Amino acid sequence: MRRDESSAIPNSQVDKGIDMFKKKDIFFKTLEEMADTLVKAVEYFADGVSNLSDVKAFAKRMKEMESECDQYTHTILKELNKTFITPIEREDIMALTTSLDDVMDGVEACASRFEMYHIKEKDEYITLFADILVRSAHQIKSAIYLLTQKKLLPMREHCISLNELENQADDLLRVCISSLFANVKDPIELIKRKEIYERLEQTTDCCEDVANTLESIIMRNS
C-alpha cells in the first residue's frame, strides 16, 4: 500500500468530525438565540407595563416568548444527551441554560399577574424595575455573544454590571415597599403590588445568577 493511501482519512471519519463541530456549534448558537429572545421579551415587557391597554394580549405574548425560550432549553438538553464533546463543560452549559430560562420565567410570571390581578394602571416603580431588567438583558446578551466567540475575560465587565444592576433593584425594592405601605390603603391592592415588586426583584436575582455562572465559566477556562 502506498504511503499516501495508508495515511488517508476515510470519508466516514471526516463526516463524523464535521458532525462533531456542528454539534458543538449548536450549543453556542442556541444560547445566542436564548439571549436574543430574552432581550426581545424584556423590551416587550417594558413597553407593556408602560401602556397596559390590553393586559390579556400582553400576558399572552409574554407566554409565547417564554415557550419559545423553553424550546431552546429542550434543544440544549437533547444535544447534551447525544454529544460527547462540548465547547465548554457540560455542567456549565446546563447551568447557563437553566439560569437564562429562569430569567425568562420570572419576567413571564410578572406579566401574567397583570392579567390575573386586573392591573390596568401604570406604576412608576414597575417601570423602573422594567428598565433595570432591560439593561440586565442587554448585559446578558453581550456576555453570551462574547462567550460564543471565546472572548472570556471581556465577559467579566458585563458580569460586574449585572451585579450592580441587581443591587439597584434591591434598593428600589426597599423604596417601593416603603412607599406602598405609606400610601396604599386598600389591602388587596397592596398585596397585588407587593407581590409584583418582589417578583421583579427576584427576576433581577436570576440575572445575577447568570452573571455568577458566567464568572464560573471564566474561571474554569481562563
Spans of features found by a protein language model:
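Cytosolic, long alpha-helical scaffolding segments
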Residues: 2, 6-222
